[in-house]
Design a protein with these regions (language model features):
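C-terminal lobe/tail of nucleotide-utilizing enzymes
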Residues: 1-52, 211, 215, 226-259
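Walker A/P-loop NTP-binding active-site region of P-loop NTPases
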Residues: 56-114, 182-186
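Phosphate/Mg2+-binding loops and adjacent switch elements
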Residues: 129-226, 231-234
Length: 259
């Protein structure tokens, strides 16, 4: 038994009913005019030409963001650029693909480690000026669910700060997780100040840096399928609202160039 390949998206009852039929409906002829689709090297050369320092790969889960991030980082490295490749995705695949001999500087946000270190830092500062009930209140406050998000956010800001000295390529988690991180920048900064008493420079500079189109670019990664494309369209709208630049879409598994 096998499921045949059909030249249409199997969405809706009508398409489900005809999926396994021997006789398939005739399809209208598609305009097969050859178009010039730039290759990924064109995108990378544009990043170099425009002096981008922070490059995100974003899109739905499973569209190939990690693979694209690695290709971009390796290509920039071949052009003599100092590159740091990072991932905010809890499913860290960078080491699996690259190993220890890639020559790239790698980092991964380990949520449990970041949470532990953030708690230790806040409590250490609290011990210097507090005791008794006040200290217990701070300790209890750190058990709130948002503490882990703040710890991850702080680590994210520290990764972005590396762009002072090198190009940072960031392989992001699936769309929703990343947008939450970006959209909450200001509120997280206030929460960091409330709990630790100060806002690190990396966090102060984060939002202006992400919104600087001369420095930051989002490379949208998708597949030639309905759901990934619609999700990328929604992502584009969200990025527009956040004032974060996105010029390029990279479509994986596309057969358009084979005509």
């Amino acid at each position: 038994f096998f499921i045949p390949l059909r030249p249409y998206n199997v969405t809706g009852l009508d398409k489900l009913r005809i999926l396994l039929d021997t006789v398939q409906p005739e399809l209208p002829e598609i305009d097969s005019e050859m178009r010039e689709y730039p290759e990924i090297s064109t995108v990378i050369n544009n990043f170099v030409k425009t002096g981008k320092k922070i490059i995100f790969t974003m899109g739905k889960g499973g569209v190939g963001k990690t693979t694209v991030a690695i290709k971009v980082a390796q290509a920039l490295q071949k052009q003599g650029k100092k590159v740091h490749l990072a991932t905010t995705d809890p499913a860290d695949h960078l080491n699996f693909y690259l190993g220890a001999t890639s020559g790239l500087s790698l980092s991964h946000i380990d949520e449990e480690k970041e949470l532990r270190e953030y708690k230790e830092e806040v409590l250490s500062k609290a011990r210097e000026t507090m005791s008794g009930d006040d200290f217990d209140y701070v300790k209890e406050d750190l058990e709130s669910p948002c503490t882990q998000e703040i710890a991850v956010f702080r680590a994210f800001a520290e990764i972005v700060e590396k762009a002072d000295d090198e190009i940072v390529v960031i392989d992001t988690a699936p769309t929703g997780h990343t947008l939450l991180l970006l959209e909450s920048t200001q509120s997280y900064a206030k929460e960091v100040e409330r709990t630790s008493g100060e806002v690190p420079k990396s966090i102060q500079k984060l939002l202006p840096r992400l919104q600087n189109s001369d420095e930051t670019e989002v490379l949208m990664v998708t597949l030639p399928e309905t759901t990934p494309v619609y999700e990328s369209m929604r992502l584009a709208d969200d990025l527009d609202r956040a004032h974060i630049a996105h010029t390029w879409w990279l479509v994986n598994q596309s057969m358009s160039a084979t005509h």
